[in-house]
Amino acid sequence: MAGNKDSSWDDIKNEGIDLEKIPIEEVLTQLRCTREGLTSDEGQTRLEIFGPNKLEEKKENKVLKFLGFMWNPLSWVMELAAIMAIALANGGGRPPDWQDFVGITVLLIINSTISFIEENNAGNAAAALMAGLAPKTKVLRDGKWSEQEAAILVPGDIISIKLGDIVPADGRLLDGDPLKIDQSALTGESLPVTKHPGQEVYSGSTCKQGELEAVVIATGVHTFFGKAAHLVDSTNQEGHFQKVLTAIGNFCICSIAIGMLIEIVVMYPIQKRAYRDGIDNLLVLLIGGIPIAMPTVLSVTMAIGSHRLSQQGAITKRMTAIEEMAGMDVLCSDKTGTLTLNKLTVDKSMVEVFVKDLDKDQLLVNAARASRVENQDAIDACIVGMLGDPREAREGITEVHFFPFNPVDKRTAITYIDANGNWHRVSKGAPEQIIELCNLREDASKRAHDIIDKFADRGLRSLAVGRQTVSEKDKNSPGEPWQFLGLLPLFDPPRHDSAETIRRALDLGVNVKMITGDQLAIGKETGRRLGMGTNMYPSSALLGQDKDESIASLPVDELIEKADGFAGVFPEHKYEIVKRLQEMKHICGMTGDGVNDAPALKRADIGIAVADATDAARSASDIVLTEPGLSVIVSAVLTSRAIFQRMKNYTIYAVSITIRIVMGFMLLALIWKFDFSPFMVLIVAILNDGTIMTISKDRVKPSPLPDSWKLKEIFATGVVLGTYLAVMTVVFFWAAESTDFFSAKFGVRSISGNPHELTAAVYLQVSIVSQALIFVTRSRSWSYVERPGFWLISAFFMAQLIATLIAVYANWNFARIRGIGWGWAGVIWLYSIVFYIPLDILKFIIRYSLSGRAWDNVIENKTAFTSKKDYGKGEREAQWAQAQRTLHGLQPAQTSDMFNDKSTYRELSEIADQAKRRAEVARLRERHTLKGHVESVVKQKGLDIEAIQQHYTL
């Protein structure tokens, strides 16, 4: 018998039985299960036979991953230098340059080791957190429904599939209404397909409409998804970040190539230099100029940053989303659950009944009948929770059919049989849908809309209830005319931190737009409470309709840019809003939690799935939040900007050092025919890399405005600073070699005509200023004002202590260096400090010439973080005073032509500034109302407003 069992399971595993085609009852027979599901013991037994319901993960070869860090264009240049050191540097009576070969190899290994360790650690931490977000599913085990990880599913399990779920395994649908299934990830079909009971649904597809049970027929690698995994495999594209990395790398390589070409042309045909001396000079440019640590520093910085984001409750599914979040200047936020608590309550005292023989309690019972008693959403839980006993929702009736909520119909409905055997249908949902369903007369419709507006003015949502008799006693029959029963006021209070979080976002130059499916009046009330402003429009305005007179002349694009939010929004509207903002060169973020948000999440530059989002929303997003509310997003923006700032700081530094090494040593080699030792420039590179690795954990001040890769700024800053440092070295060499300036002024012995001691002096001077440059590029203001992180400053002083000791004491003939003593070391340190000071001024001049905004940092020291508690107080008071004067007609409102030019962040930040101004005006208006005065007194006295509102209505 056991043998037959095993044979049967083998047939199922090997697809010997076509479970997709045979009748559903035969499927249950073959799988030895019933519609009541499996027991836990049977599930465990089958799990051992079929394995977990997940795809086999590709095992990563650690050795190949390690070697992969040595396989990039910058590493190839260093590897070319290593080959040159032993293959070409072999002449002039000297052996191959083995010390340089070994040094280059050690440098490559150090970079790869650090990258491997840090990225591995960050990856493991992120994987552990992602495991907590593993797909879940509703499964029927031991006769009870429970939410379990999808990995435990086995053939024969009964699962529930509802709107927003990603189908966890291949299955056959059981009895019920058809589902709408999106199979685009598997088959490429652009439109959802209708799946009827008995048909198969595939793992990885998304439920777009309906709710139904299914029996699992295949799991893991045996599913359609598993067999066609190559169709949906992640390509791990690096996108814009990789393009930037390539552009900077190419710039550095081209700079080195030009320098080498000039050296070859001048040294050999013109100066007739010895072959080996020329090779050594070329090696100096190759070894010192190539930013070998750049891929390591940037990837490690991003990996560590991703780990930090995950600790803050934002898990990055796509690493490059970090740089996009740093540049985000518009955030389109869902209202319900993100800006509000998504914990609805009904104000029973304000319930409006439209039928004479019905009271408020009976209206609530009818609404509860049109609600789920299991697997409830927020509205269902709110309505059923208003009953004394939740069982009243089904007491005395027999449920025939339940029509679940979907974003298109915006209502639920139940068909039931009462105690007398009569059939009825009750529906609850969006008022407009129910009003249209009931075909209300004009007077009744006007009364309903007046009540809805009254609710909306108080920040309450409206829920309508309708009822009809089904005389045909058939769930598919249209029934008698619908009767409008009444309206229920629902209130979803804002999160306690939403208003402050939105103000923080606006201060950071991120314009928050509310995108809600609720009515316009509710959106405006919520926006006013949250300080977002009330410049909101209905979704019809997106089509050029129903616009205010004040904005009638504005094109739709400008309207979207100027609005604080949109109400009555459908999924296609969200997608259109994001698309239009992107076309206007905005970096757009979008939050969402439902399946209807998935298209907009995928379209947005940064799709953010909020806490408790559906599987479909998580799948479409770039960042998954593990904590509710907007505050985690603002924290993630600041962290992303800090991460991005570290990466940008390093790229400017890398370009500067390349120019500095290439130009400086090329001039020394061609003007004075000075042959610097390749080994010593290798020591400079190793010490530099050791210090620079700590930049991934450096303390930085995030940009006060959205930031992005500005290659023009990076290259311009790098070229100017690098040229200055090169000239600084050339001047130092000239003074030490051709004059007695240092001897006369500081009493040190002359090293003129002593190439080995000159090598030591140049080595120390290059080492000090090359590393000190990072303090200039890492700071937005004066470098000596912004304190670096402990590890960076410690690494700098440790590296320079080693460099100084080498310059003072080293006597290495193979490296052509002889110690110069502490006197010269002190002179070089003083020279370096004096010529370091102009670097900040050069930085400001470059930024000012490129953007005109660098002096803001010099004069105002404007940063995202500050220790001053009253930062921006004067500016806020001025804005408040201006808002008051504008409100009372004492001065005309300021206008801005911000829509004409989007080329700089000054214009982009004006959007956020205008939103702040509108929010201040809205709050000012509120304080001139009785309600506003009461709330102000309550706040000043520290009273509990919620407790007061339970007994009094303002």
UniProtKB/Swiss-Prot annotation:
It is found in: Membrane. Its EC number is 7.1.2.1. It catalyses: ATP + H2O + H(+)(in) = ADP + phosphate + 2 H(+)(out). Residues 952-954 are annotated as: Interaction with 14-3-3 proteins. The chain crosses the membrane at residues 67-86, 99-119, 249-269, 279-296, 649-670, 676-698, 715-735, 757-777, 790-810, 819-839. The modification Phosphoserine is found at S936. InterPro entries: ATPase_P-typ_cation-transptr_N (IPR004014), ATPase_P-typ_cyto_dom_N (IPR023299), ATPase_P-typ_P_site (IPR018303), ATPase_P-typ_TM_dom_sf (IPR023298), ATPase_P-typ_transduc_dom_A_sf (IPR008250), HAD-like_sf (IPR036412), HAD_sf (IPR023214), P-type_ATPase_IIIA (IPR006534). Keywords: ATP-binding, Hydrogen ion transport, Ion transport, Magnesium, Membrane, Metal-binding, Nucleotide-binding, Phosphoprotein, Translocase, Transmembrane, Transmembrane helix, Transport. Binds to 14-3-3 proteins. The binding is induced by phosphorylation of Thr-953. Binding to 14-3-3 proteins activates the H(+)-ATPase. The modification Phosphothreonine is found at T886, T953. One of its GO terms (biological process) is proton export across plasma membrane. SMART domains: Cation_ATPase_N (SM00831). Its main location: membrane. Belongs to the cation transport ATPase (P-type) (TC 3.A.3) family. Type IIIA subfamily. This is ATPase 9, plasma membrane-type.
